[in-house]
């Protein structure tokens, strides 16, 4: 794992800057703590990473988050046996509508990035398909106990694409720790970032009554549950969460809709808005868009964890 030097320890108790969301505007926000350059050893030798930086600004009708894609928390180590790539810095802009609009029907995220955190690191939850075949109907759930060990995730539930992009597959633990909300309930709802369709993303706490800011904060649980019985064809075996298709949505469970979100008030949108929730169980990161995602959020690059299936999962049978 790569850490800042003790003499310049990470100071990331909260994202620095000001969010001015009441008028659909965001003032400049800085997410660059005083990290020294960090050494990430690649297959080709050592590379020094610059200090992490992320800036958000309002350019009507868009919000733009520009990042150098360097995590602002401890990460790695990379490469590792399940993920043979190194984190690489490059400037990238993520663009979302400042006034998001719901589409006529939810849209599966497919192999697109779902969104971006305020520290400039993308959310990209999709995993490889069984036998590397997208037509198989079975997609590995990267966060599952049987798939995760072979995909090289670090303790922030993240790993690296072949082009060096560090991205989260589950709750961004390093970011949550730096905000002081990884374990203890927060005092108010915590905005973590934005989905590619522009709707905000919050951590797993929300008001008991969605439209009442005076109601207490409670943990918001997903409505997804494991299917009963065994898989029909494909990898066989019981529905144990190894595959995305092992889950089904049950509207009687939890407080969230199939998009892992709900409409309600938040500290940043006191009049209410649809917002996604990152939960601590499936789907962790939502898998459906409410609105139209912007094209600045890319699809997967083939490599371990995508449909370059890691060797240990290539012939998987339950």
Predicted regions and their residues:
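Solvent-exposed N-terminal domain segments of exported/luminal and surface proteins
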Residues: 34-147
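N-terminal secretory signal peptides
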Residues: 1-9, 20-23
């Amino acid at each position: 794992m790569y850490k800042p030097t003790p003499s310049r320890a990470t100071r990331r108790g909260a994202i620095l800057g000001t969010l001015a969301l009441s008028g659909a505007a965001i003032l400049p926000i800085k997410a660059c703590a005083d990290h020294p350059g960090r050494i990430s050893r690649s297959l080709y030798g050592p590379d020094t990473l610059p200090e992490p930086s992320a800036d958000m600004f309002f350019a009507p009708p868009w919000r733009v988050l520009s990042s150098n894609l360097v995590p602002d928390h401890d990460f790695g180590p990379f490469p590792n046996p399940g993920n043979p790539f190194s984190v690489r810095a490059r400037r990238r802009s993520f663009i979302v509508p400042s006034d998001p609009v719901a589409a006529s029907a939810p849209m599966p995220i497919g192999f697109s990035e779902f969104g971006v955190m305020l520290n400039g690191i993308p959310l990209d939850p999709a995993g490889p398909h069984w036998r590397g075949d997208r037509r198989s109907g079975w997609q590995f759930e990267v966060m599952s106990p049987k798939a995760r060990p072979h995909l090289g995730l670090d303790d922030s539930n993240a790993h690296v694409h072949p082009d060096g992009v560090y991205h989260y597959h589950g709750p961004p633990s390093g970011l949550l720790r730096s905000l002081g909300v990884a374990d203890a309930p927060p005092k108010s709802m915590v905005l973590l970032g934005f989905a590619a369709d522009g709707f905000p993303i919050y951590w797993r706490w929300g008001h008991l009554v969605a439209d009442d800011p005076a109601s207490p904060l409670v943990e918001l649980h997903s409505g997804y549950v494991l299917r009963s019985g065994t898989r029909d064809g494909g990898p066989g075996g019981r529905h144990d969460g190894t595959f995305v298709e092992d889950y089904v949505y049950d509207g009687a469970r939890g407080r969230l809709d199939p998009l892992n979100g709900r409409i309600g008030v938040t500290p940043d949108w006191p009049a209410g808005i649809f917002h996604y929730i990152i939960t601590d169980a499936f789907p962790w990161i939502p898998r459906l868009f409410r609105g139209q995602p912007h094209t600045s959020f890319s699809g997967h690059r083939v490599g371990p964890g995508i449909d370059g299936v890691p060797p240990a999962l290539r012939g998987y049978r339950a």
